[in-house]
Each structure stands twice: as structure tokens, then as C-alpha cells.
């Protein structure tokens, strides 16, 4: 892999440098500095280290410049460890926040890594430079790879979608979304490039770069569309000014079979004008820059600056040459199949569009009429498009229009002419673009193969915010809004809905990303209408303008949250919409014309009649022009691709685009979407620059963070149970028992066997869900398992092949030995004289016998040659006959074959007809059953209709009763109105009387308001109390007058109050009665509606049944048509059969004549002829039987067909009768429904009137009650004043009686006291009002604090407060009398108390604000803690995974150890066996050596006897002269000696043979010994290698365990850091809780003081105290929660400490184990050295054995030295035995050491296992405790959310109760409207039923006709069959006559043979004849 070694140039932009990620320095720096992210104005977020924490603020030091900054805790975001730097999938980040995501994207972007996974989708940042990551090498790298195997890339997304399409058989789509200039078009091209390579490389070509024609065209379609549809904008040099959806179709095997491109909303206005620094479409610049001189002259081209439509002249694009691009466009067009004529025609149209802009109109002097002074440009245009100049100018300047029935010429103004030219240019370019698109689609869909599935790629114009945003920008942004909503809905809503559907544990998360309000603002049709609907509506009005459209939009949508009117209006046609990507200001100028898109039909008709075929083809559908001018002329389109609209229908651009977009969204919803989020890094189009705030805004808008969060928290991978079992059962092979098992149960068993963590998966109803990465892990394990299985299979195969080769070699070895033995025997025999004599004599013995045999053979040969000649002549004759017969046979076989084929066809036809007949019969039976069911239902419906009629009568009676009750209510209402009028008159009188009081009260209220608004003025008025004493006397007189008036008014008010209370009680009773009646009416209406709905439901069921019946009738018609076709084919087959029969008859007669001619030749031919005649007769019989059976079948078919036709006609008549009954019942039901609807309307109107009157009465009652309460308040105030004045008067008179001398002084005192009293009264009133205001302010504050809890209580307490207020006022009246006596002394105390109260109130308000702020901070900290808890939960899950992985590895380690033990035991057994075999072979060798020695001794004895005999012979020869006499005796002794010599020789030979055999045996033994030694050495070596491999594996596992322990240590350190942070947060929480407790205690003290001081003044403060108590209770609960959290944290700390201790213990144990393993390894090394020494000794032994073999071979040559060599051998064998014994003792000692080492290893393993198990159990227990604590916290949180939800519910119920009465009338209205709509639906259904009945009648007539035709055809077939039978009979009789003549009796006798054989022969005979 490229990652391991040095990365290549292209791989640097794909792979991350792992050394940088795993840097220990960076890790240590991150841990030591406590690095975090803080907000930055320049970079978005900046790295900093925490230095100090001050409560809610933190002092941090910036990493970049070392500057210290104070930041709020809530503004800090966590930083990920360095190992997560440049991570490929941002879902893997431990700390997920905006800063981390931005940092990751920034780091990857600056490293050239532009692709990054973000959960389930991919994020792409535009690099603004070329990167070498799109080559063929990269394509091959990504081909067929899984997503996690390769770094992020657009190729990976494309490959995933392609593989998912092939595997799941689901359509896929790749959606590239983002702002304009983000790189959507480029990524779309790369997707197409990748698919073109991947989908065409399957076709078996060697060179994968060679793509097919279709793939080339698919790649070249994009450049053509870009040339004509892309342009340079401010943001993007190659901006798509149209949207396109590329649908690539694939067949089942994954080949591309075709493609189709759909486009959306071409920005055609760009063709006539462009903004500053922008270009029009590329093709104009390509043409002007790249055209050659000849083409320029042909197309009348000029320079860039001479064209008006090129607003900015020539605007170059950096790094792009227009002339080169022009050539590339032409090449692409030629590849797509555009010929040169078509290319030239397209360029002519492009040039004509440019020339249209150069036509200049001027205004005439005296009139507004336009004129064309210079028509040069017009001439050029007409030349290019092939029309007449004069006609063109006339059509532009004075077009003909239709006014009524007359056609007149209308002069155009300059503005109208300019507009007409611009509209023509836009329409021409749009039509050219559409033509090119249709031509491209035609080229891409050449194959006409059916695509199994498709992959769609969406490239649509990105979100645009320009300086001037027009109608095109609205449509583009509306499309992007819909796509973003699709993304949000797919990622967040559908995902969570699937979780809930499948029933897995999931809390629904609302991410708040719903864009529906913005979409509805644009597309909503009504209530209120959206932007597009209002635009369409304005287009209908002739006097409508863009300004009126915007005004109407503001009036309709002014209050919409997403609609704004700009603050600084540049133009009255501007408005703003808040999109998901930001606010966009739209300018609606010329929107009406853009939406209508009108055209001058005079010019279009000219273009339609153009002499240029291409232009005429472009304008051939002139009638289908969108616009108001063509409304009356619109007809169905002549284009095949155009949509067919009704005549006279007006379709606007907005409507068409909305429909197109709706279809696109429906297509996308039906596919599996793969999202690619393109991000623009900066607006300067500079590479290497990334604007942090711009990227952050795009990330927020696109929902990237939310997508990552749901990917992490959710279960994005899911798989169906059956597929999971099928795919991963190999991993848990023995988990599922044999037999049937439910898929879910099987998956549960498999999951248990796989030992997956329960947090990593969820089991639903039909699928199993996994977290990210789990399926990839399972796939890797599956691949490993499959590789192991395949390797085992390969090993078995190789073993089998090796054994087979070995057996073959053994066989070859034995064969070689046999050959060697034979050769050795021959070598021994060839020098033996007797053998030579035998070989010479034996041939001579047979010579005499051979001559006799030769003569006999010659005679036989002569006889045989004669016979052969005769046989040859006979054979020739027979061959001639055979050839003739073979020819005849072939002819007959061909005829028979043709007959059999015909018979088979007719049989198939018969079977088919029988099957169809059976199907028809089954359908008929079903129809009869359904008819019976329909009849039963009809009867039920009639019974229900009767019940309905009865119910209707009951309802009518009830309605009459209700009408009577309504009349009574109206009478009561009239009386109530009269009473109300009287009461109103009385109130008017009272108003007149109390007008003066009200004026004074208003003055006092104004003063109170002034006092409340300005406290400083109140203090100044308190200081100036002395100044007001002079006014006291005048005030006393005025108050006395007022007292009298007030007493009178009070009495009158009391009377009126009593009267009003009586009236009010009466009204309440009446209202209660009315409400009861209304409730009864509602119940009755509800019942009626239920009955109506039931009736409608029944009607719907009847209609559905009728539709089903109609469908079945249609199916029967189809069956009947099929039968008719089968009958026609049967007739044709019959005619064919008749013709063939005639031919057969003629051929039979010819054959018979030929047979008669050949019968006389031989007896064999006569027999053949007799057989053939028998076959002919059998054939005739078979034909007769066939015809009879066929006739019977035809008869049966006719009868059944007629029966079926009769049954169908009966069914049709029954259907007619049922339909008539249904129509009647439907009419009656409709009448009843109409009556019911009328009654419902009357009831609704009556109810509305009653409700209206009831509301009026309630309003009047409320007014009266308020007036009464006001009067009572005024009366109480006046009575207070009266009592005060009386007391004052009494005090003054007492003072006058006491001291008459001091009258003046007393008078002054009285005056001062009076003024003081007046002031104190005013102050009292002001204080009471202030108190009320303060209490109301307190309530408001408490209501704001507890708004979710107390709104219901406030409304209930309002009534109680009124009653309490009356009672408190009465109590205050009595108390004020007492308090006035000592008021002078207490007034100063009251002032002080007032000031103190004010101060305390201010302090309380401040405390409340502080508490609110503290509460907000607590909420923030709680949220932060919750996030940290979530991170801890994620860490816990990771820890659990680590523990489970460790357990798995421990188990694997145990298994490996067990396998090692087994293998070592096997090796020990094998070694024992080998040693036993060696011992056996040694004993055999010793026995052989003994035998050898014995043989040698025998040989020596023989030699000795031989020598003795030779000596005797020599003695005898020498003594011959001496003993010559006795010659006879000597001869005898010679003969005896010779015989003895021969015997001795034979014995010697035998002994030599024995010696040879022993030598051979010894050789074999040595060879076997060598082979065994070699095998033993190889086994030992293999075992050593296996042991070494296992040792390496163990070392590897130890290393892995060490790394895992290191990771665990790091994670523990992270957890410790998190714990410290949590402890700090807890300390902060404790401090906040302490401050809250202190504040609470101070508030309690202050409240107690207030209670002591304000017991007599205000009892309403009790409610405030109760609410405060509740706040304190909640604070106590918070304290408890904080304490519990602190306890939990302490527990966590203890657990962490225990875990750390356990980890240290485990580390120690691990080190001990490592030492023991090292010692065992050293022991093992010594054993290996010992083994090597033994091997060296064995090698020496082998060399010695080889030497012994050489010595043994020398023994065979030198027999004399055999004994010496045997002694040497015996000595060496003795030494070998001693060495073997030494080796055996050494081996035993090694075995003992090995056993001791094994026992030690087992003990160590047991200890390690026990310790590991104890630590794992402790960790699991701690994890369980932590989980319980987390669950407890979750339960508390759920309880809090439940209480909040309950309060919300209460609030909603109160609001619903408030609005219920208001909504009732609206509901009744809606019910009435629903009734009307239901009646309309019923009418529509009636009309549809009538149409269906007409269709049924027509179908019935058609069926009748077809049945008649079928019966006629059946009769004709019957006649034809009869004729055929008669013909067959006649033919058989005619052909049978000559056979009788020729055959005689023999033929007749042979006819008694088996009929079956004759039948078969007959069929063969007919077949051959027919074919001939």
C-alpha cells in the first residue's frame, strides 16, 4: 500500500501522513497545555491553552502569539487529540464541535486533501487549482473497493452508489449541492468519467482505457451542454446557468445501456444582457474566437465589441483559451453524431442571435411609432435564418393582430419593438438549446435495451446572492431550498422515523432544520398564496404591474417570518426572503413578462415557414408558445417530447418550472440519495485561502454537524435479517441449529456468537441496525474467514495432488525394480552354455512343423480368397440395395418427422386451448361467486338503505323539534334583547350621573400614573406637603358637597347592581340552557355525520367492487380475444394439415406403385413390402382414431364454449340488473344527502346565529360587570373620603370646644391637619396604587419566571382576586376609621416604611435578576455537562469495546496455547513412533548382518571343499601314469567327481544368489533408512519453523497487548483530565449553589420583614411568597442534584483510582509474564541448540552409513575380504548402538525438561487468566455502576422533561379552552363546506359510474360480437373437421386397394399384429412423406 512506503505525487493528495498524526511530541504538548479552541475574529477559532479559571470565565493563552485573553466558559470548545488531525471521517472525532470540524477541513485543505467524509455524506472544498487525483491510475485504485479501504474521493462515492445499485437493485442518485462556484459541475463530470470507465471495463477488453462508443458519447455530452449552457459569473468562471439531471441506465450485469439528460430553467435572459464582469454563454465567445475566415464570412461574424448583446465585450477567463475550446466543442459534437451541416446550422442560429441585438429602432418625430432607419443587421439576420427582410421588418414594426373577427395592423413603439427583438432572441436560443439536448439524448439512447436500474447525477445551479437578484435567482434558490429540505428530511426525519417504525430504542431529536416555511412562502397555492401563485395571478390581469405584484405580496405575506420588506427601498419592486443560506433581496422588475414569456406570432410564423430546414424545424411547433398572445391558438404539441396541454390553456414559466421540480423531487425520493456537499473556500477564487466564517456559515446551513451527530448517535447501517444471516453465517457457523428458524431469532443467535457489544447494534422488526464501522469490521472478519477456508481448501487439494503423484512414483519404482530384476536375470543367463544351447536348438525343432503348417495355410488361403470374392460380389449387391433402402427410409423418416411435428403442434394447440378453457371456467366460477356476494351485499345495502330512510325520518322529526326549540330561543332572545336595552338605558343614566366622578377619577388616575412613572416627583411632592395645608378648608367644603352626591349615587348604584345581578343570573341560566341545547344539537349532528360517512364508505366499497367487476370483464374480453387468435391459428393449421394429407395421399399411391414394381425381385423385398403395408394399415387406423378423438374434442370445446358464452351473457345481464339497482339506490342516496346537506346548512346557520348572539350577550355582561365593579370601587373610595371627613370635622369641633381662645390657632391647626389629611389620603391612595403596581410587577416577573406553570392559575385566580379585592376594600374602610385617629403620629413611620419598602423591592428585583442570571448560567453549565456526559458515554462505549476486544484476544491466545499443546503432543507421539521404527529397523539390520555372516561362512566352506577337490583332481592326473591299468576305475571316479563338481557349482550358485538377495535387502534397508531420516529431519525442521512462527505470533500479540495497554493508559489520562474538569465544574456548581442558598436565606429574611410590615396593607403578597417557596424548593432540588452529582463524581474518582491500581497490577503481572516467557524462550533456544547437535550427529551417521554401503558393494566383488568387512560392520554397529543409547537418554532428559516447562507455562497461564478475569470483572462492575448512574441521571432528566411537558400541556389546554368557543363556528363552517364537497364528490362518482356503465355496455356488445364470431368459427371448424374425416376415409380406402391385390393373404394375416407398433410405424411413414 502507498501509505506504508513513500507516497507518490498523486497519492500525496489522497493519503494522510501517519507519522505526523502519531507524533508523541504533539500528544504530550496537547496533554500538558490543556489546549482548547477559543473564538477568533480572523480565523473563526484559534488554539489556546487554559491558564486560570475564574468562576464562569477562563484565562487562556493563545498558542500563536502567547497573548493572554479572558473568555467565557461557554465560549470555549474542546480540542481533539493530535491523532485525530486530518481525520478522513469527521464522525470519528471525539469532540464534535464547529471549531474541530473547521480545523479538520482547514488542515486537510492546506494539505491538498479536498475530500472529507462527514458521516454518511462527503464534503468537498473547491481547491481552485488542478490536482492529479483523477487519472486512470486513481480510477483503478478505487474500482471495486469498499468505502473504508480507501481515502475519501468522489470516485468512492460513485463506486459505492454503483455497487449498491447492482447489489440491492435500487435506483441511486448522487446529489452535488452547494453555492455557486463550489465545484458541483466538476464533481459531476468526474462521476460520469468514473462510471464510463467502470461500467464499460466489464466487457472483457484487455485495455481498460478503451471505452465503447456510448461511453465516449456520454463523456462528450457534458462539454456540448457546458458550451451552450454555462457562463462566467462573478463567483464562478464556469457557472451552470441551467440545471441538469443525468440519468445513466444500466442493465442487470452493470453495463451502461443508455443515458438521458433532463434540464431545468435555462437562464436565457443572459443571452441578451449580462452584469458587470460577467459573460454570456460560452458558445458565443468560442465561435467569435475560434472560427476560421471562411466560417466567419459564411456566418457574417464580426468583432466582440460590435455586438450589443455582448454587454461587456470580450471578457477573458484565466487559464482557458476560447479558440481551443471551440475546436473541442466541434469534436464533441462530431462524436455525438452531429454532421457538418447540423453543426453549421447551429452556429448560424448562434450568429443570428448576436445579429438580432444589433437591430436598432428609432422613434419617429411626430408619433410614438418605431422605425428602422438602418436594416443592415436585419438583412444579416434574415440571410442567416432564411426569411424575407421586408416581411420581417413588417412583422416587427407593424404586426397584424386579431381584434374580434377582424385582423388589423398595429404600429409598435420603440420600446415594444426592442422588447419583441429581445424576446425573439431569447426564444431562439432556448429552442436551439432544447434541440441540442434532444439530439444528445437521441444519441445516448441508441441501444434501446431495457435498463434494469439507473444512477442519476444532479448538477443544478448553486445558491446565488448577487447585487441584483431577479426571477431566475428566485427559481434557482427555490430549487436549492427544496434540495436542502430533501437532505434534511432524508438525513434527520426519515432516519429517525425508520428507527421508530422498527421499534428500536430512540429519542426523537429535533435538529430545527425545517425549511418548509421558506418553501411554502414561494410555492403555496392559497391561504395565503405564495410568491409564484401571486405572480401567476397577476399575469391574468391586463393592468397588473410589477409594483402591484409586490404590493399584493406584501399585503398577503407581510407577516410571514421568512418575508421581509427592505428598510432602505431603492425601488418599489423590491422584497426580501430569508433562505437557509441567508437573506436575499429580490428585484421584481420585469417579472410578469418573464413569467408570461410572450412572443410576436407574426415573426414566429415567418420562422416556421423559413427556407432553412433547420430553422423551420426549430419553430415547427409555433402554436405551443407560452404567453398570453397565444392563449387561443395553443394546441397539442407536434414534438414527441413536448407535454400535451389542453387547447386554450395558459401555462406560465413558474408553473412549468414548479411541475418540473416536483417531478424531479419525486424521482429523487424514489432513489437512494448519496449527498456530496460542495463548499466554496473564498469569494476571490484563490487557491490556498480559506475564509473561516464563510465555511462555517455553509457548514451550518448544510447541516453538516447535525449529520455527523446523528451518524454517531444513530445506527446508519442496516441490513435485512435474511441477508445478514446469509452473508455473515460463516462467522458463526455452529450458532444456528439445523432446521427452520425465524430470521430474527437466527440473527439474535448470530449476534450472541459474534460477541458484539449491545451498544453497537439494535434489532428491529425486519432489520438489524449497526453503528458506523461495525459492518465494515464484520466484512473484514468475513474476508479473513473466507481466505482461511480457501487456503484450507487449497491445502487439501495440494495434499491430494501430492499423494496422487507419490502413489504414481511408487508404482513407477516397483516397475523399475521388476525391469531391473529381469535384466539382472538375463545378464546371468546369457553366458550360461546350456542357455545358449537352448536358444539355438529350440527354433530348429519347429522348422519341420512349420512347413506342414505352411502348406495347410496356403490351402486355407485359397479357399478364403474364393469365399472373399463371392462375399465381395454379394456385398456390392447388398450395398446397392442398402443405399436404395436407405434413401427410401430417409424419405419416409422425413415424412414421418413432418407428420409428428404437425401432430405435436396440434397437440400443443389442444393443450393450450384446454388450459385456457379451464382458466375461463375458473374465472366464470369466480365471477359467479362474486356475483352471489354482490347480490348479498346489494340486499344488505337495501336493508341499510331502509334503515337510513328510517333514521332520516327520525332526524326530520328531531329537526322539527329543534326548529321549535330554535323559535323558542329566538323569542327568548327578543325578550333578552329588550331587557338588555332597558339595562343599557339605565346604564346611560348612571353614566350621566357618574360623569363628574369619572372625570375626577381620571384626574386622580393621571396623577397616579405620573407618580408611578416618576418616583423623584413623588419625593418632591412629599417635601411640599406643608404648602398644601392652605387648601384644606376649601377641600373640606368641596368634599362635603361630594359626600352628599356620592351617597345618592351609591344608593342608586346599589339598586342598579342588584337589578343587574338578577338580570345576569337570568342570562346565565338562559345561556346554560342554550349551551345544553347546542350540545344536544352537536351530538345529533355528529351522529348524522357518522351515518353519512358510513353510507359514503359503503358507496365507495360498491364503486370499488364495481371497478373490480369491470376489470374482470376486461380480462375476460382479453381471454376471449386470445381464444379467437388461437382459433384462427387452429384453422390455419387445419388447412395446412389438409394440404399435407392430399400430398401424402398422392405420395402413398406413388409409393405403392413403386412397391408393386419391386415386389417381384426377392423374397426379402416381399417381406418388407408386407411389413410396410401392415404399417400403412396401422397408420390408417391411427389416423381414423385421431380424427375421431379430435372431432370429440372439438365437439366438447364447442359445447363448453357455448356454455361459457351463455354464462357470460347471463352474468352481463345480472350485472346490468345490479347496476340499475345500484343507480337507483345511488340516486335516492344522493337525494337524501342533498336533503341532509340542506338541513345541515340550516342548522349551521342557526347555530352561528345563536353563537353570535351568545357572544354579544357575554360581551354585554362583561361590560356591565366591569361597570359595576368600577362603580363599587368609586363608591368605596367616596365612602372612605366621607368617613375621613367626618372624623376630621369631629376632631375640629372638639378642638374648638376645648379652647375657644385659641380658635385662630386651632383653625390654622385644623387647616394644616386637613391639608395633611388630604395629602396623607392622596399619599395613601398613591401608596396603595404603588403597592398594587409593585405587586403586579412582581407577578409579572414571577409569571415570566414561571410562565409555563402559572398561566392556568392566574386565570382562575382572577375571579378570586376580584372577590378578595371587594372584601379587602371593605376591611380597609373599617380599618381606615380606626387608623385616622392615630394617623398623624404614624405618617412619618409610613413614609419611612414606604421608602424602606421601595428599597427592599429594588433589592428584591435585583436579587431576582441575579437569580435569573444564575439560573441561565446553571442551564448553560448543565448543557455543557450534558455534552461532556455524552462524550463520556462515547468514551465508555469505546472502553467497553476495548474490553471486549481484549477478552476476544485472550480467548484467541488460549486457543493458540491449546493448539500448541496439541501440536507438541502430536510431535512427541510421532517422535516415539519414529524411534520405535528405527529400533525395529536396527534389529532387522542386525538379523540381516547375522544371515550375511552365515552365508559368508557357508561360502568359505564351499570354497575350501572346492579347493580340496581340485587338489584331488591334480593328484589323480599326476598319478595317471602310475596307475594306467585301472583306467575304467579312474573314469568312474572322474564321472563321480564331475557330478560332485556340478553339485558343488549349483550349491555355489545358490549361495551366490543368497548373498545377492541379502545384499539387495540391505540396500533396500539403507535406502528406507535414509528416506526415513530425511523425512524425520524435514518434520523436525517444519516443527521448528512452526514453533518459531508461533513464537513470533506470541511476540506480536504481546506487542499488540502492550500497545492496547498504552492506548488504555492514554484514555485513562484523558478520562482523568475530563474528571478534573468535571471536578472544577462541580466546584463552580457548589459555589453557585452556596450563593443561591445565601441569596435564598437573605430573601427569606427580607420576606419575613415584609410580611411583618405589610400584613395589614396587602394580603396579595401571599401568592408571591408561595411562588418564591416553589422557586426555593426547586433550588433545593438543584442543590440535592448537585450533591448527588458530587457523590457520583466521588464514586467515579474512586472507581478510576481502583481501575488505575488494577491496571498497574496487570502491568506488573504482564512484566513478570514477559520475563517468564523470555526465560522459557532461552530454555527453548538451548533445546534447539541440542537438537542441532543431534542433527549434526545424525548427518555424521548418515555419512558413515554411506561408507558402509560402499564397503558392502566392494564385498560382492571381493568375497575373500567379506569376513573382515563383516567384523568392521559389527564394530561400527556396536558404536552406533552406544551413540543411539546416548541419544535416547538425552532425548528422555529433553522430554522431562519440556514437560516441566509445559507445567510451568500452564501455571503461568492460569494465574494470568485468573488475574485478567478478576480485573475484567472489576472493570465490568464499575462500568455497570457508571451505567446505572448515567441511567439515573437520564431518568431524572426524563422526569424533568415530563414535568415540563405536563406544564406545556396545561398551558395548551388553557389556550385551547380559551379558543374553543371561537373555533366552534369555524368548525361548523368547515363541516358545511365538507358536506358540500362530499355532495360534489358523489356527483362526480355518479358521472363516472355512468361513464363506466356506458363502457360496460360497449364492451358487452363487443363481447357479444366476438362470441358470435367465435361460434361461427367453431361451426366452420367442425365442418372442416368433418370434411377432413371424410377425405381421410376416402383416401385410406383408395390407398388400401392395391395392397390387397399384391399382398394376398399374408397382408391380411399380418394385420392381426399389435396396434401400437403399427400406430408408431404409421406416424413415422406419414412424417417422412410429408416432409418429402
UniProtKB/Swiss-Prot annotation:
Location in the cell: Melanosome; Cytoplasm, Myofibril
Protein name: Myosin-11
Job of this protein: Muscle contraction.
Biased composition (Polar residues): 1771-1788
PANTHER family: MYOSIN HEAVY CHAIN, NON-MUSCLE, MYOSIN-11
Record domain Myosin motor: where: 85-783
Phosphoserine: residues bearing it: 8, 23, 40, 1684, 1722, 1954, 1971
Subunit structure: Muscle myosin is a hexameric protein that consists of 2 heavy chain subunits (MHC), 2 alkali light chain subunits (MLC) and 2 regulatory light chain subunits (MLC-2).
Gene Ontology terms describing biological process: cardiac muscle cell development; elastic fiber assembly; skeletal muscle myosin thick filament assembly; smooth muscle contraction
Family classification: Belongs to the TRAFAC class myosin-kinesin ATPase superfamily. Myosin family.
Domain notes: The rodlike tail sequence is highly repetitive, showing cycles of a 28-residue repeat pattern composed of 4 heptapeptides, characteristic for alpha-helical coiled coils.
InterPro entries, A to Z: Kinesin_motor_dom_sf, Myosin_head_motor_dom-like, Myosin_N, Myosin_S1_N, Myosin_tail, P-loop_NTPase
Domain IQ as annotated: residue spans: 786-815
Modified residues (Phosphothreonine): 1177, 1951
Region (C-terminal): 1935-1972
Gene name as annotated: Myh11
Keyword vocabulary terms for this entry: Actin-binding, ATP-binding, Calmodulin-binding, Coiled coil, Cytoplasm, Methylation, Motor protein, Muscle protein, Myosin, Nucleotide-binding, Phosphoprotein, Thick filament
Residues covered by region (Disordered): 1771-1797, 1867-1972
Species this protein is from: Mus musculus
Major location category of this protein: other
